[in-house]
Amino acid sequence: MEIILCAVQPYLAKAWREHISEDLSRTVRVVEGSILSLDVAAVVSPANSFGFMDGGLDALYTQYFGPQLQQRLQRMIREQTGGELLVGQALLVETGHPRIRWCISAPTMRVPRGLETAEPAYLATRAAVRCALAA
């Protein structure tokens, strides 16, 4: 499995490149540009615990894949996790798109708000990688 970190801001791509160790460079690649322009099996969504995909990167995904992505995610959250996908959990959602078939929803927050620490991002990343490995 290859992990691609995409950044539309050059400073972010530069920072990632500076902090990826040589060991990680075999499986982690940094790309400057949009993830939607690449041929990848899945994208990761940092949605919230209730699957609302109407802001930030999630809004871009909803625009690209269509509103059915949010609808599928919210249905899966209701049916598989009792109505809330906790930070540290992830779900694999079919996009319905011919090129990018999957979206891994791994919330970084329960409801939309700023993050005070890096822990939610760590937990979401861990959950997304585990979800991808299990697929």
Language model: regions and residue ranges:
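Macrodomain-like recognition of ADP-ribose-binding/processing modules
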Residues: 1-135
